[in-house]
């Protein structure tokens, strides 16, 4: 289902935990990471499509999350020609997306990447809010920038821990499986440097990647086919 301009209606999902870290999924059989996303089927509302994709790709149910916000309008990105079959390059241009910001109210163990027969991810992790801007494939970077920026105001309103004032490229922390004892030293450092303008620095950390064994005969993602626009090999992940 394409609109008159050649864009497929789609939803994107930013799932955050209590520490304002975002769910970051590794595409099955590939080395690329992205947010959950998927096409809106005929007759579905964006919210209905979001809950369906959330279960299909992450294994979560509506009771595991709370909707914090959504983008006001469609955000669009174009898919490069090398990812599109030649016969539809004049028709299909890319995706137009409504993005949802969800607060995780369930537990990490509720996340099940094998909730369906055709999983999208084979590993996941929690990452600092702005990290995906530098990690996502280039042609999605601008729409990630717009979605994260627009929805960041809801994160600050709904949680007492503010987002990093450095934004993109600044200090960040990814979960390393330990407790928050490092926060005490960070607080003391903040007191020592209060009132001084400090340049942004990059903190290199080790994050925990949760890998699930996914047995599937599904081949690697292929260029988008026109036979069924709502059921591409990559589940509208391009």
From Swiss-Prot:
<feature type="region of interest" description="Disordered">
    <location>
        <begin position="161"/>
        <end position="238"/>
    </location>
</feature>
<feature type="compositionally biased region" description="Basic and acidic residues">
    <location>
        <begin position="171"/>
        <end position="181"/>
    </location>
</feature>
<feature type="compositionally biased region" description="Polar residues">
    <location>
        <begin position="188"/>
        <end position="199"/>
    </location>
</feature>
<dbReference type="InterPro" id="IPR015797">
    <property type="entry name" value="NUDIX_hydrolase-like_dom_sf"/>
</dbReference>
<dbReference type="InterPro" id="IPR022927">
    <property type="entry name" value="RppH"/>
</dbReference>
<feature type="short sequence motif" description="Nudix box">
    <location>
        <begin position="38"/>
        <end position="59"/>
    </location>
</feature>
<dbReference type="GO" id="GO:0016462">
    <property type="term" value="F:pyrophosphatase activity"/>
</dbReference>
<dbReference type="InterPro" id="IPR000086">
    <property type="entry name" value="NUDIX_hydrolase_dom"/>
</dbReference>
<comment type="similarity">
    <text>Belongs to the Nudix hydrolase family. RppH subfamily.</text>
</comment>
<dbReference type="InterPro" id="IPR020084">
    <property type="entry name" value="NUDIX_hydrolase_CS"/>
</dbReference>
<protein>
    <recommendedName>
        <fullName>RNA pyrophosphohydrolase</fullName>
        <ecNumber>3.6.1.-</ecNumber>
    </recommendedName>
</protein>
<dbReference type="InterPro" id="IPR020476">
    <property type="entry name" value="Nudix_hydrolase"/>
</dbReference>
<comment type="function">
    <text>Accelerates the degradation of transcripts by removing pyrophosphate from the 5'-end of triphosphorylated RNA, leading to a more labile monophosphorylated state that can stimulate subsequent ribonuclease cleavage.</text>
</comment>
<dbReference type="Pfam" id="PF00293">
    <property type="entry name" value="NUDIX"/>
</dbReference>
<feature type="compositionally biased region" description="Low complexity">
    <location>
        <begin position="204"/>
        <end position="217"/>
    </location>
</feature>
<keyword id="KW-0378">Hydrolase</keyword>
<feature type="domain" description="Nudix hydrolase">
    <location>
        <begin position="6"/>
        <end position="149"/>
    </location>
</feature>
């Amino acid at each position: 289902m394409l609109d008159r301009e050649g864009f497929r209606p789609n939803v994107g999902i930013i799932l955050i935990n209590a520490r304002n870290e975002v769910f970051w999924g590794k595409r099955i059989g590939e080395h690329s990471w992205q947010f959950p996303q998927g096409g809106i089927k005929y007759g579905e509302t964006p919210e209905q499509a979001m809950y369906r994709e959330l279960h299909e790709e992450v294994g979560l149910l509506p009771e595991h999350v709370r909707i914090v916000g959504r983008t006001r309008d469609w955000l669009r990105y174009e898919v490069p020609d090398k990812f599109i079959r030649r016969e539809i390059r004049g028709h299909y241009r890319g995706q137009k997306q409504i993005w949802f910001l969800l607060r995780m109210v369930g537990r990490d163990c509720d996340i099940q990447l094998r909730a369906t027969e055709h999983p999208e991810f084979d590993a996941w992790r929690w990452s600092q809010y702005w990290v995906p801007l530098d990690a996502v494939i280039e042609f999605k970077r601008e729409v990630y920038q717009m979605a994260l920026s627009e929805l960041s105001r809801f994160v600050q309103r709904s949680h007492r821990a503010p987002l990093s004032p450095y934004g993109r490229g600044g200090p960040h922390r990814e979960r390393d499986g330990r407790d928050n004892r490092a926060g005490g030293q960070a607080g003391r450092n903040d007191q020592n440097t209060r009132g001084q303008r400090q340049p942004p620095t990059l903190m290199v950390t080790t994050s925990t990647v949760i890998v699930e064994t996914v047995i599937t005969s599904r081949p690697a993602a292929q260029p988008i086919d026109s036979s069924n626009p709502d059921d591409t090999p990559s589940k509208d992940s391009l």
